[in-house]
Amino acid sequence: MLPRLAKSSLIQQVRGVSAIANAEPSGPSISTSIPGPKSKALKQEMDKVHQTTSVRFHVDYEKSFGNYVVDADGNALLDVYTQISSLPLGYNHPDLVKVASQPHLITSLVSRPALGSFPRTDFADGISHALTSIAPKGLKAVQTMLCGTSANENAIKTAFIWYQAQRRGGLGPDALHLESCMNQQKPGTPNLSVMGFEGAFHGRSLCMLSVTRSKPIHKVDIPAFDWPIAKFPRYKYPLDQNVAYNKKQDQECLADVEAKISEWKRRDNDVAAIIVEPIQAEGGDHYGSPAFFQGLRDITSKHGIVFIVDEVQTGGGATGDIWAHDHWNLSSPPDMVTFSKKLLTGGYFYGEHLRVKEAYRIYNTWMGDPTKLLLLEKAVEVIKRDGLIEQSREVGAEFQKRLGELQASSGGKLDQARGRGTFAAVDFPSGSLRDKFVDLAISNGLHCGGCGDRSLRFRPSLVYTKKHLDLTFDLLDKTLKGL
Amino acid sequence: MLPRLAKSSLIQQVRGVSAIANAEPSGPSISTSIPGPKSKALKQEMDKVHQTTSVRFHVDYEKSFGNYVVDADGNALLDVYTQISSLPLGYNHPDLVKVASQPHLITSLVSRPALGSFPRTDFADGISHALTSIAPKGLKAVQTMLCGTSANENAIKTAFIWYQAQRRGGLGPDALHLESCMNQQKPGTPNLSVMGFEGAFHGRSLCMLSVTRSKPIHKVDIPAFDWPIAKFPRYKYPLDQNVAYNKKQDQECLADVEAKISEWKRRDNDVAAIIVEPIQAEGGDHYGSPAFFQGLRDITSKHGIVFIVDEVQTGGGATGDIWAHDHWNLSSPPDMVTFSKKLLTGGYFYGEHLRVKEAYRIYNTWMGDPTKLLLLEKAVEVIKRDGLIEQSREVGAEFQKRLGELQASSGGKLDQARGRGTFAAVDFPSGSLRDKFVDLAISNGLHCGGCGDRSLRFRPSLVYTKKHLDLTFDLLDKTLKGL
């Protein structure tokens, strides 16, 4: 392995006094409505050249720090939404800012490799530190991609390639397959399907939308593959008071999975893979039990179906484990685990049996982005050094307790408080009341967000501590009273 | 608009003496076989954690500069392949290295926005300088995405959304559409298709593979949408000696387009969009004439079909125009133009009629990467300042002339020399001979690459000058003689 070029401490020193914020405020400070006049003016400018329909407010990223996002008007909000759960260490973490000064990051940025063909000399080293060191149990091989959607797309392609190879007795494509695929005829272009679940979200490409059932606005007007969708458990909370009901949910859903595998087989459209989130996040924070997922593992093993766990939103530590599926105690590991968001780079881990033997089948120009891998390498180091997963577990336990208490005192406005670690949600009676609550919370200095039809979700980063928790619940309480 | 934070000249000064190369060698220097012993050792390391089937050699990106790529073993090659045509200004361009020092780039890197909801204060400014300033005639609105594939996917989604709105008299989705799409039933999930062309390459997601016909290994074992593929012209060269033959190609291909539009309409699977490359690059550098593309524009206008030009490989100036479709002189602009690679960020320009009115329909967490936009802003400034498109046109004219002469003197080894600007190709009698030539050229210090079944392609960056051209043809001549 070649040595890394030394960091220049002079660069860091200069950077340290630059215009990037380097400390958290002691609390939120709000001086305008949100969006304020500057955010509104920027949105008008932006609308001339780019869609703005989903823009909430513009952010001053130079002034944001830690758990606090600062908007264009100088309002500082405690952020428990963190760019849709995609910041592992909050804003402008000093260790990441330092990495940004290093020559190997700069060259990664300005001389971007086609890494499937011409990787950087430090690529394997980066993969080992950033990803192999946090690999899910049983899955050492990894492939980087640019985002969660491309991770899922390529995981599914890998599953199809494996499934077809199994049909050929383990062999690669023969002349007949290679010829027929150019006309999209069998056997080269097979009928194969992927099973998703009601409420699932796996991305917005046409393939991923075919297994996504989060919201109509995500899917309407877009053609889709005719792939099976099975039921996903809908538990009642608290769990310990609804054991029988919830167990029946698991059984019904697993029976539905089995039935649809058979149905699609009869329709000559075999299920090659099942893709599932540990917690259906965009769809409304719906949880599955370890027993449910163990059932899925057993069914997929029995039928020779690739079992893909989509940890794009759950991976990275906020659930109190680096992977949300860690606590399932499966009899054997999932075949693939996909990731993105908090892990900065997209990608997937896979079992060695799925490694594609032929070149250029899982391939594209960039196959990820080495700048993200270098940042992740440092982020993982910080997460381990500072015990941030343990912190999420501890602060998360307190979060769950407090959320339950808030619900109990809400006079029926809140329901179904649930979560793992700091990854948490609670339901409102309606979507409109939830939306009103989010707006009011933002104006009170707490940046939270919705998911599903009427859920409020919490997605703080890993630098969220007890002090931020206390402030969060003060602001939630205040907002609830003002609703 | 808020002012950008000032650059620190001290940072730049420090950076200038760092370990990043800042000058080109006078010519190639080769001291080992390629891949050499260090590249081979790195590949072995990499293979433990990541697929390596397509890896040619490892690159020392800190030592690479301008038109020269330096491999792990210290070999310096003149690079006319440039990371599969994705470097606009070669390696480690000093102006881009400077941008990497700026606080707004660093915060973009370490505090990445969910830019559809919380954009940076300088986002509209960056869009205007980086993209609007080079917008294709008639298309001012733009959407950034992460890569060429996601650009094409979202362009196609936009086309579907528009096509369905037209069917509803310009209206958004109603309750029936919203409800039915969750079960993937009509009318919410329509039967709609996209037309591609024989030899096309638009990316490797399942949707894009359905309109891709580059090579069997890209498509085999992957399920696909049943979408129409029309014939694409296959011209004979030189063009001025094959006018009648080539004109007939255009006519036959356009008739095929018309016939397949009708056929898919009869099958209740309307063609909502046609996607086409100006030059089919991965498929083997196949060109269409201005008359062919004018015919496509006329047909799509007549049928109310969205006309998408995929400039992922051609966009950015190497053809002697910023957009390869600039010289078609269409009666009206394309409806959409997609881009990536040399433009550093993915994305697409679109006509205002295609702007999606409802929020969260064209959306995802990141929707691009602001670091790439900031780099592109500087790259566009350099391209204009240094007259690099004009340079590509001039050097390109000489390149075409010399390639024709090389072919004439090749004793039948080369055929079909063709190109625009420095974007050029030539054919070998077989794929195996082409592959042998590429290997030998690399060992002689010229990094070129293949495309299609038996073509050699040239993809220098925009900093390629007459001096590099002379060296290129010396090396081509030497390699051809050694073949």
Curated annotation (Swiss-Prot), chains A, B:
Annotated localization? Mitochondrion matrix
Give the matching InterPro entries.
4NH2But_aminotransferase_euk, Aminotrans_3, Aminotrans_3_PPA_site, PyrdxlP-dep_Trfase, PyrdxlP-dep_Trfase_major, PyrdxlP-dep_Trfase_small
**Residue positions binding pyridoxal 5'-phosphate:** 148-149, 365
Give the GO molecular function terms. (S)-3-amino-2-methylpropionate transaminase activity; 4-aminobutyrate:2-oxoglutarate transaminase activity; pyridoxal phosphate binding
Keyword Glycosyltransferase among record annotations: no
| One Gene Ontology cellular component annotation held by this UniProt entry | mitochondrion
* N6-(pyridoxal phosphate)lysine: residues bearing it: 341
Q: Which UniProt keywords apply?
A: Aminotransferase, Mitochondrion, Neurotransmitter degradation, Pyridoxal phosphate, Transferase, Transit peptide
PROSITE patterns tied to this protein: AA_TRANSFER_CLASS_3
Q: Which cofactor does it need?
A: pyridoxal 5'-phosphate
Enzyme Commission numbers on file: 2.6.1.19, 2.6.1.22
Pfam families, alphabetized: Aminotran_3
Name the NCBIfam families on file.
Answer: GABAtrns_euk
The record's subunit annotation is: Homodimer.
What family does the entry list? Answer: Belongs to the class-III pyridoxal-phosphate-dependent aminotransferase family.
How is this protein named in the record? Probable 4-aminobutyrate aminotransferase, mitochondrial
Which species does the entry assign this protein to? Answer: Caenorhabditis elegans
